[in-house]
Regions:
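Domain-terminus/edge residues, biased toward the C-terminal soluble/receptor-binding domains
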Residues: 54-55, 67-169
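Active-site-adjacent loops and short helices of periplasmic peptidoglycan-processing enzymes
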Residues: 1-74, 84
Length: 169
């Protein structure tokens, strides 16, 4: 997110770099802004994922950079299904090609933005996890939703399209 120390952005504004470009500093800024404090924010993140049934997900930090952050494809499926049902506006942010707020412009690197079937998702990368992604598509006459979740992929985009193609056979 290229945030500067002392810069003031609203939590809602921080969602754009966090979801569009996986901004670690934005995620940490949201955690720091939480009134009881960062540690309580992370604790609440863990309580929340457990409350929706994502029992094998654990957050050590807000940004996702710690190797102690863990999840599974099944848990990520539970989380994205919750988002789709309860807060689909989050996905709208992931569909933006770019967003400018004051002096910042963030450009979404997702290669699926030009596909009309793509309805949103989130990419990530750490050396331990390699490239990860959750990608959602609405396809077919009945606009059925398909999710492709990749963990540890070195070819994230082509793997996503290959798996989606396989699911549609």
């Amino acid at each position: 997110g290229n945030l500067r120390f002392g810069e003031k952005l609203r939590v809602g504004e921080l969602m754009y770099p966090m979801l569009m470009v996986s901004s670690n500093d934005s995620a940490e800024a949201v955690a720091q802004a939480y009134d009881p404090g960062r540690d309580k924010f992370i604790k609440e993140m863990n309580i929340w994922v457990n409350s929706i049934g994502a029992y094998r997900t654990y957050f050590k930090d807000a940004s996702g950079l710690s190797p102690q952050n863990v999840s599974t494809a099944q848990d990520l499926s539970i989380i994205i299904q919750w988002v789709l049902k309860n807060d689909p506006e989050i996905l709208d942010i992931t569909l933006l090609k770019s967003k400018t707020i004051r002096t910042h412009t963030w450009t979404n690197p997702t290669h699926f933005l030009n596909l009309t079937s793509y309805i949103g998702g989130k990419n990530g990368y750490t050396p331990e996890a390699d490239r990860t992604s959750v990608s959602l598509f609405k396809i077919g006459k009945y606009k059925r939703t398909y999710g492709v979740i990749l963990l540890g992929s070195s070819q994230r985009d082509s793997d996503t399209l290959d798996l989606l193609d396989e699911a549609l056979r």
